Structure formats: structure tokens, C-alpha cells
């Protein structure tokens, strides 16, 4: 297998395609103009297409992924707001676009050829709509509303519609600002990173009602740190034993060891990393973590210890200007 890395460059209005080798060296395969400022990217469930959200003309572009990982432009569709996060349901038929500045979430159908079709539904008045995450059963979409300190849950139907009258509200503490979400399938838990507070909330998901119950809050900032936080991204390792969280004030990635007993879940360490680490990616085998620095204009590759979950820096490479999103693909 080979690992391909996709990085969006907001200021350059480009996407870079890199190949990661077994010795952790990389080579640049391709650089493509995106005809606008690229923001979120996501790979289709069948690994055949890459979707990129751009602004100021709000669109989602699809690119065909060739056998070597390089891209060819395929199609595009208009979005109702500036995209900042994408999610795809488990069937691979529907793309959810969160818009923080336009306070909405939209649904774009994806046809069998990977073409994004016109938006079929827009949910408005989700203030600070930052990200979404589908539950294990493809029946409920969780959506973060950063400006409201809230996570919403909407029932999702097989016809690709969210039922607005089923919305449930789950509040964080005031001025926490829930941002990105991830799901731990083995324990049916939702994890949310709080941008303004520098912490992670751990939620239990009721398998029948999709109600969230807050189990624990974990601080990710340095000991005795008491200033403003600016936390951004989080990802659970494929083995579901470790959680990684980035913060853009301290320029760190924190490592949290996950346990079945929530009382035993704790932060086990952190590393200094790129300047302003807005997003990062863990490959599907759980062997490496790659983080981009929005201010450092570079990205770093870390080897993940499968025993301890700790990170070992293996390489750093320069990118174009303002890398804001990264995704990894095993081919």
C-alpha cells in the first residue's frame, strides 16, 4: 500500500498532493489551482473522489483520485454558505457542509459517479456551525454550534433528510465553544474539543434515543496555563485507544489515553508542533499522524507508538502559504 497526503493552501489557492514513503520521507506529486480559497477536504467512502470546499464563491469541487493518488477535476456544485467542515454519511451518498459564518448546515447528494448534486436541504440558525459527525448507525447527525455552547442532534432518514422537528440540544459549559467532533465506536461515545476553553468533553450516546450524557471534561492545556485557549482539531486513533487534540495558542498536540472506565481516561502527554496547528490527520492503519502549521507553512510527520500512543517526530517539509486542511489516503 502507498500513503497519499492532500493539503489545502488557502493563500495560494492550491492543493498539494504528496506521497509518504516507508522511511517517512515524502515527495511532492502534484500542485493544483483550486480557483478560490480551499478549506475543508474529505475523501469519498470508496476512495475514488476527493471533495474540496472553496470560497468566496461557495462551492464543493470533486476530483477523481487516480491510481497514483494524483487528482483530476471532475465536477462542482454550489453551497449556501462558506464551507469550513465536511462529513459524509456511511452510505457515501450525502455530504454535509458546515458553515460557521453563515450559521447553517447543508446536504449535498453525491451520485454514483461522485458528482456533487444541488443542495437538497439547509438547516439554518445553527450559530457557529463548525462541524458534524454521523452516529454509528447512520441515523443521527451531531452538529456543533460553537457560538451557542451547544451540540445538536438531528434524526437522519434513509432519503437523505434531517428531521428538523427531532432536534435535541446538549449544552456544554458557558464559553466552552464546541468545535470538532469524533466518535468512539467501541464505547459509543462522542468526543468534542472546546475551542475557547482548551478542553475535551466526553459524551455517552444512548443507542436508542441518541441522547448525550456528559461523562467527563479533560483539560488539554499546559499545567497552570490560565490564558485564552484556541483549540481546534481532534481525532481518535483507528485502534480507538488514544485521542489526539491540537491547540493553536500553545502549538501543541495532546495525547489522551482512552479507557472503558471513563474515570481512568486521562491526558498522558503533549508535544510542541507546528505553528498554529489547525488540522491534522491520522492514517487508516494508525501508524502516523501528520499535522499542518497554518503559520509555519510546513507540516510534520510523526510515528505513533501502538503501545503507548506517544508521538515521535520523523520529518518536516515546507508547503505553500497557509495550509489549513490535511487528509491522508491509503491506496
Swiss-Prot record:
Belongs to the cycloisomerase 2 family. InterPro entries: 6-phosphogluconolactonase_YbhE (IPR022528), Cycloisomerase_2 (IPR050282), Lactonase_7-beta_prop (IPR019405), N2O_reductase_N (IPR011045), WD40/YVTN_repeat-like_dom_sf (IPR015943). SUPFAM superfamilies: Nitrous oxide reductase, N-terminal domain, Thermostable phytase (3-phytase). Pathway: Carbohydrate degradation; pentose phosphate pathway; D-ribulose 5-phosphate from D-glucose 6-phosphate (oxidative stage): step 2/3. One of its GO terms (molecular function) is 6-phosphogluconolactonase activity. Pfam families: Lactonase. Keywords: Carbohydrate metabolism, Glucose metabolism, Hydrolase. GO terms for cellular component: cytosol. Its EC number is 3.1.1.31. GO terms for biological process: glucose metabolic process; pentose-phosphate shunt, oxidative branch. Catalyzes the hydrolysis of 6-phosphogluconolactone to 6-phosphogluconate. It catalyses: 6-phospho-D-glucono-1,5-lactone + H2O = 6-phospho-D-gluconate + H(+). It comes from Buchnera aphidicola subsp. Baizongia pistaciae (strain Bp). It comes from the Bacteria. This is 6-phosphogluconolactonase.
